[in-house]
């Protein structure tokens, strides 16, 4: 059975459009309440919901039409961790009692990129390491490894594309970070989050990352396939004034 990417291109563009529409509405409401600034646009909670249809479409089209796709309700989106008791995810996919996929959806819009990038990086690294360790320690029981993903939408603007210098007087910064813009830093972050044994493609796209999700779904559809899917392709998908980077 060939993988079906479920119109990912169109759905990704709709997701970006919905993000900016939702953010603009939040800012307008904020101004009406005279609370000022960027806060509502940043904290508008469900601005990334437009990408849920893309993820759910991949699940439904690749062998698990009756899978439970959890997107709401704190108890439904909570998984145990190894270094902390629990972690709240944005999307969880189950086939019966088996965890098929866990995905985080994030965004980063200016004007501040410096500290916020570090916060996003620390969050992504911690989340990936925590869940991977819990899985190795057997928290999910006897099942195939689930698909795990971290998708971030970054504003494509002058500040995010500007070269940034770092000062590290005691030891040198890794070459791939020297003079790198924040957009490039996100790409480097995603590449380095890839599980050992995979080499990033020279031109990373959203499509190959979603193919990994589809392949994982298909592996659950065929229980006799016991290959350990150690996967992770980063993806960058330029759409209008945004760029989507995905690490799976």
Swiss-Prot record:
Its EC number is 3.1.21.4. It is an enzyme of class 3 (hydrolase). It comes from the Bacteria. The keyword Hydrolase applies. Pfam families: XhoI. GO terms for biological process: DNA restriction-modification system. It catalyses: Endonucleolytic cleavage of DNA to give specific double-stranded fragments with terminal 5'-phosphates. One of its GO terms (molecular function) is DNA binding. The keyword Nuclease applies. Disulfide bonds: none annotated. Keywords: Endonuclease, Hydrolase, Nuclease, Restriction system. Belongs to the XhoI type II restriction endonuclease family. This is Type II restriction enzyme XhoI. It comes from Xanthomonas vasicola.
């Amino acid at each position: 059975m060939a993988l079906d990417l479920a119109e990912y291109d169109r759905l990704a563009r709709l997701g970006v459009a919905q993000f900016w529409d939702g953010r603009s509405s939040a800012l307008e409401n904020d101004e009406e309440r005279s609370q000022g600034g960027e806060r509502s646009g940043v904290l508008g909670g469900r601005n990334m919901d437009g990408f849920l249809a893309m993820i759910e479409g991949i699940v439904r089209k690749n062998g698990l039409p009756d899978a439970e796709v959890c997107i709401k309700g704190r108890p439904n989106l909570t998984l145990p961790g190894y270094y902390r008791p629990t972690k709240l995810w944005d999307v969880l996919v189950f086939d019966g009692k088996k965890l098929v996929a866990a995905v985080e959806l994030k965004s980063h819009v200016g004007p501040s990129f410096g500290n916020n990038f570090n916060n996003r990086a620390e969050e992504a690294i911690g989340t990936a390491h925590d869940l991977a360790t819990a899985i190795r320690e057997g928290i999910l029981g006897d099942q195939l490894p689930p698909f795990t993903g971290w998708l971030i939408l970054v504003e494509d603007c002058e500040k995010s594309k500007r070269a940034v210098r770092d000062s590290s007087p005691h030891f040198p910064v890794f070459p791939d970070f020297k003079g790198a813009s924040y957009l490039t830093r996100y790409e480097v972050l995603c590449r380095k989050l890839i599980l050992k044994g995979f080499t990033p493609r020279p031109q990373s796209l959203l499509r190959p990352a979603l193919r990994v999700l589809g392949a994982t779904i298909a592996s659950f559809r065929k229980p006799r396939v016991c290959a350990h899917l150690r996967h992770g392709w980063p993806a960058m998908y330029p759409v209008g004034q945004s760029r989507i980077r995905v690490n799976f």
